[in-house]
Regions:
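N-terminal Rossmann/SDR dinucleotide-binding element
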Residues: 1-73
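SDR active-site strand-loop-helix element
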Residues: 6, 32, 74-77, 116-122, ...
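Conserved catalytic-core motifs of eukaryotic protein kinase domains, centered on the activation segment
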Residues: 41-42, 84-91, 127-131, 179-180
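NAD(P)H-binding glycine-rich loop region in Rossmannoid oxidoreductase-like domains
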Residues: 57-96
Length: 360
């Protein structure tokens, strides 16, 4: 089996590469990535690309068609990947997350790819009062990031897919340790605050709901999806990926971290205005379709892995929100240094100064 992983040098892609190699040891794995975060390694001995057969550098908006030749499955992770980045680069978010994703899906279908897996998001539900959101419930995307995800999902259903099966995994909020760690995720941020500062400050009143999924379980869901048959949910499926027990209020997350990191204080702004982004999610369809891929990593285990990982790194950066572990800060540094344009394309000068060279 030949698998193309777009965005393989990111937070999820680094874990997915390892997971795919473990599950399909004889497969041919090809990575495609712009390289924006290639240097953001958790440790110098953790280079996931060594598990690939080939690494290709490029812009997902200009992916070469021939790269899809002979590919059996595509795991499409490339994206401007959270709300702050979507707000800062709103137009680019639409271009990369939606326009390029839809174009890639059509290209994959035209080239005979059997399975196309799209990393979508539960953030499309936005503000959801009442019970947990099911796939059939209305979506209220409140951000450019969320709009790009639901826009892509809808467009996939209008494509000429031929024999290709499409799976849009509406992931819960990611958390957990990775070879390319991100600290701009709610649980990861809380653990970093506890380790470096001994205090977690919750800027909201702590009431908003968030579903969580460990990055290891995200990878396991993708492994299931790249082998999914159309009779298992339909030719073009959108499914919430997570577990019902993974729905938490933000204050519960902070309190869980404080229990595991001794001496951590939790400060909650109970006078803060309500956070519009609040939603509980129903994961019963995923449990039915993919019982072997139901998330296994508990909240406490995610916290422990993060705490152990950060401690092993000697992490003590109280100013980590300005570090490479915050993806928006990394992009902004590239732009200020003249390596990236405002529309997130490598500038010619970067080719000789920093930009990674293409590898065959």
């Amino acid at each position: 089996m030949r698998v193309l992983i777009t965005g393989n040098m990111g937070y999820v892609g680094s874990v997915l590469t390892r997971c795919l190699r473990a599950n399909f040891p004889a497969s041919e794995l090809i990575g495609f990535d712009a390289g924006f975060f290639g240097h953001c390694l958790t440790g110098p001995d953790l280079l996931p690309e060594t598990l690939l057969d080939r690494q290709v550098f490029g812009d997902i908006r200009d992916i070469p068609a021939e790269l899809l030749n002979g590919v059996d499955a595509v795991a499409h992770l490339s994206a401007v990947s959270n709300d702050p980045m979507g707000a800062r680069f709103e137009a680019v978010t639409g271009e990369v997350n939606q326009k390029a994703s839809v174009a890639l899906a059509q290209l994959a279908a035209d080239r005979g790819v059997k399975n196309f897996v799209f990393a979508s998001s539960c953030s499309i539900y936005g503000f959801a009062e009442g019970g947990p959101r099911k796939e059939s419930d209305p979506t209220i995307p409140l951000t450019a990031y969320a709009r790009s995800k639901i826009g892509s999902e809808k467009a996939f259903g209008e494509l000429e897919l031929d024999a290709m099966t499409v799976t849009s995994l509406r992931f819960a909020t990611a958390c957990g340790m990775s070879e390319r760690l991100r600290l701009d995720l709610v649980l990861n941020d809380f653990v970093a605050c506890a380790i470096a500062c001994g205090e977690i400050t919750v800027l909201s009143d702590g009431a908003p709901w968030r579903p969580l999924i460990d990055v290891e379980d995200m990878a396991r869901a993708i492994v299931w999806a790249i082998a999914r048959k159309p009779e298992e949910g339909g030719k073009c499926l959108a499914v919430n990926a997570g577990r019902d027990e993974g729905n938490y209020q933000v204050r519960e997350l902070a309190e869980a971290v404080a229990r595991q990191v001794p001496g951590t204080r939790v400060s909650i702004n109970r006078n803060a205005p309500p956070d519009k982004r609040s939603y509980k999610v129903d994961f019963s369809l995923f449990r039915k379709l993919a019982p072997a891929a139901v998330p296994q990593v508990s909240l406490d285990e995610s916290i422990k892995r993060l705490s152990d990982g950060l401690t092993a790194m000697g992490f003590a950066d109280r100013d980590f929100r300005n570090s490479p572990y915050m993806r928006l800060k990394t992009l902004e540094r590239h732009i200020v240094a003249g390596r990236l344009s405002a529309d997130l394309r490598w500038l010619p000068a970067a080719a000789t100064s920093w930009r990674p060279a293409a590898a065959a």
